[in-house]
Each structure stands twice: as structure tokens, then as C-alpha cells.
Amino acid sequence: MIIEIFYQTRKCFVPRMNCADEVSMTNFHSDEYDDIHCSLKSFEEAFAFFEQLERNGDVKSYCNGANKSGRWIFQIYSTEFVEELAAVINRALGRRRKTPPVLEIMSGDGRLTEFLQPLVKRHCIATDSRDGRYNIGYPKWVETLDAMDAIAKYSPSFIIMCWEPYLSMTGIEIVKMGIPVAWIGNPNMCGHTDIFDRYHIPLESKFALSRHDIFMEKEFKTDVFFFNCKPKWI
């Protein structure tokens, strides 16, 4: 079944913050913008931040490291987004006696794993091949492993993939293994579209934000897609 809904853009209502709230979350008069992922913000705060960046014409440069931490940003995390992802992972884990870890592959700087760990009832491990494609600052605790080697090493109970490289076939090979997977990204710009020929369940998240969105038009282009997962977990 080929996904169709996300080949178009997703639109939803986003509440407006007042001006005081918008200004307090960042200093738009400084030489560099604050790092939105320095700590986890609410969806409303994150949306307002990027709406202002878009007004200034700075979304692309900001996401390419023009912020106080020099952080590259692809998916934009918020409290609500992380909480709903963690809830699905916890339901998938259930009450199993065995405790293999949750594994994030292609994790970049591992920020999603950091945000998820306090909410997930299993040890979370972040890995990345560090292939030099982007100028990402990798913390030492992000283990240098490509996706297949990481899976072979840790035999995870659940796998997270966020912004798989465009036209990569790795996601398809991983889904074929039968391990529960959360695939996060823009179906038109991440991974290979053939992955959606396999059975999957979209989260249809109201809180998914990314660098590709058109914030002032409230057009959002990413979601979480679950493979090898039961509908009752979502």
C-alpha cells in the first residue's frame, strides 16, 4: 500500500502565542539564535520560534547550524511530540521479561534519544555512522556504528529512524527483519518511497514539525510511520 496523504502537505490549526511569549523564548536581537533543542520546548513554543525564523528568512540557515550550539536540525522536537512517541514505544515494549534496548540508528547528535530516555521504560542507545555528510557535532556517547551493525550488536526490541537519507534502502531492509520500527520524516525527502509498499501505520501526529514545513501557512510535511507494529499500540 503506497502512502498518499503525505505526498500532499498536512495542515492543522496551531494556537497563536502572545508577543511576550514569542520574545521570551529566544533573543532575536542577538547575533545568533538560541538552540531550540537545548532543552525540550512545548509545541506551541517551537512552532512560534520557527514561524518567526521563517518571517526572517532564516529557517534553512538556522537548521544548518546557524544557532548558538551550531546544531543541525531536521525534525523539530517538542514535549508533545516526544511524549506521544514514547507512549507508543512503551505500549510496544509491554511487560516483556527480556529487556533488549531501544535503538536509534542514524541518530545524528542523539538529541531524540536524550529526550526519549526519561520517558521510555527501557535503556535507549543512539548510534550513527558519522559518515561526514553533515557537519554534525556528535557527543561521545553516540556510538559510531552503521545501522545494520548496530542492530546486529544490540538485537533491539524497538528501532527508531529519524530522517533516513534520501533514497537509502536501509530502512526497507530493516523493516523486513520484523522488528518494530518508528520511521520519522518527510516521505518525499527521506529514505526510499518503496518502504511504504509495506504495511505501516501513520501516527498522524499534530505535533510533527520539520525544517521542510511552511510555518506561516501551517503546512507540515512529516509524520511518524510505524512498521511491524500492532494498531492497538498506536
Sequence positions of predicted segments:
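C-terminal substrate-binding/active-site "lid" region of AdoMet-derived donor-dependent transferases
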Residues: L167-F225
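Adenosine-cofactor binding site in Rossmann-like domains, unifying the SAM/SAH pocket
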Residues: I125-K153
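S-adenosyl-L-methionine
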Residues: I2-L93
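Short, polar loop motifs at secondary-structure junctions
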Residues: G110, D128-R133, Y166, N186-M189
